């Protein structure tokens, strides 16, 4: 379902762009999961390639952003990121479970928006634009920080110790 849905969306967009003879600068947010052996990653990569082909054929600016794990306010639990899921679970008294304690490459949503604005201002024409992560952490580190923020801030009414921009952004999530 997700494979077909993602590709249908891009195909409909390309058809609309062609029908209207649009020369709009299109920015696609793809995923660092493009290279994983799953239907989500495959659909994201194929969608990006479809738009890149349209842009090349029509001599139009296209930025295909390959984005690391995004976190920040308004993330949806069980959908956007493990940060949103853990935050939701902790806030609701649930016990988060770590499936795989892997290393995550992360970017805060505000930092991602800045990257997108830069791409627009610079008219970045790159079908495979790799957005650099601004932080890296193990899943267990994220969980530990989020749990400590809840304990210190919510339970005890104290501002937790924040040591860097990543921790500030995580706290603001």
Residue spans for each PLM region:
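SDR active-site strand-loop-helix element
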Residues: 26-32, 65-67
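Substrate-positioning beta->alpha
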Residues: 75-85, 99-121, 140-144
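Mid/C-terminal beta-alpha module of Rossmann-like enzyme folds, strongest
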Residues: 118-173
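Conserved beta-loop-beta element that borders a ligand/cofactor-binding pocket
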Residues: 52-75, 88, 94-105
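Conserved catalytic-site region of short-chain dehydrogenase/reductase
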Residues: 32-39, 70-74
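NAD(P)-cofactor binding segment of oxidoreductase domains
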Residues: 2-27, 45-52
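Hydrophobic alpha-helix immediately C-terminal to the catalytic Tyr-X-X-X-Lys motif of short-chain
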Residues: 46, 50-54, 86, 142
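Short-chain dehydrogenase/reductase
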Residues: 3-7, 37-48, 76-80, 106
């Amino acid at each position: 379902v997700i494979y077909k849905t993602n590709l249908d969306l891009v195909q409909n967009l390309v058809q609309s762009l062609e029908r209207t003879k649009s020369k709009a600068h299109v920015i696609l947010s793809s995923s660092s999961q493009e290279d994983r052996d799953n239907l989500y990653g495959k659909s994201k990569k194929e969608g990006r390639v479809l738009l890149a082909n349209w842009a090349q054929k029509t001599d139009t600016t296209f930025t295909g952003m390959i984005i690391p794990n995004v976190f920040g306010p308004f993330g949806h639990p069980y959908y956007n990121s493990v940060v949103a899921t853990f935050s939701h679970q902790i806030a609701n008294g649930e016990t988060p479970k770590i499936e795989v304690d892997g290393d995550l490459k992360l970017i805060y949503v505000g930092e991602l928006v800045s990257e997108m604005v830069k791409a627009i201002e610079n008219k970045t024409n790159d079908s495979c634009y790799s957005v650099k992560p601004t932080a890296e952490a193990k899943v267990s580190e994220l969980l530990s920080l989020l749990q400590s923020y809840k304990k210190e801030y919510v339970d005890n009414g104290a501002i937790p110790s924040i040591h860097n921009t990543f921790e500030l952004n995580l706290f603001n999530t």
